[in-house]
């Protein structure tokens, strides 16, 4: 999205930003145990429709009995190292990685409220595609193309149009309710890029998007993931979009939504989110806030991912 000052400072100021320089990385497998997944989501689930069965055949479902990834055993140490290195550069990191097959969650413990910038376009797309699935709106081929460009190349114009048409702040409120996102809230000034969330909420959003438990039908969720898998090297405004996950996990197939924003005080904010691996096994969210120029800030968040995954893969 275009570089613009954050106008939601009043809302963010109400939440203490936790500086996590040198904080201890944590393994939070219990946070995503099978019991928690079941208890925190609607109990009644509709029977799979043929298109859902087809999608499940294409994308293998989560395998709860899967063996832990050996590399995950070293990840807490590398997350701590990445956090410390970023802190030495003046950057504050919030990072979380989920193994969907085992439920293991590794984070640096920073659950601060963050500005989402263009990552809010996920919520706009989710709400719009659900309305289409429920027959509340009819999307033309031009609308679908605009949605694709919004997700792939971060088109602000399309986001602005869909946001206004679909009810503005109600978009975020409805998505947060369906997915149980406790830290996610609409912007106080009505500007979609000032939507706030947290790394745990964004991890949860992707996880539930992928298994359909957030309410969006799997065929519509597949539209979002397909667009994220085709994320362009630069945004429609020319801003580089390969920072963080794409350039850090260069040996993995990734589907990402990026966000960036300048002038949060004297800092640049970069947010890299998405699903990773040929079977969409992993979800990662990493956000960096750094008082530096945009190129330096992009390099910092990318280096953090490379420190965590030195071989370019999970």
UniProtKB/Swiss-Prot annotation:
Signal sequence coordinates: 1-22
Gene: lppW
Annotated compartments: Cell membrane
Membrane topology: Lipid-anchor
Protein's UniProt name: Putative lipoprotein LppW
Lipidated positions per record (S-diacylglycerol cysteine): 23
PROSITE patterns: PROKAR_LIPOPROTEIN
Keywords of this entry: Cell membrane, Lipoprotein, Membrane, Palmitate, Signal
Keyword set includes Lipoprotein: yes
Organism: Mycobacterium tuberculosis (strain ATCC 25618 / H37Rv)
Lipid modification (N-palmitoyl cysteine), residues: 23
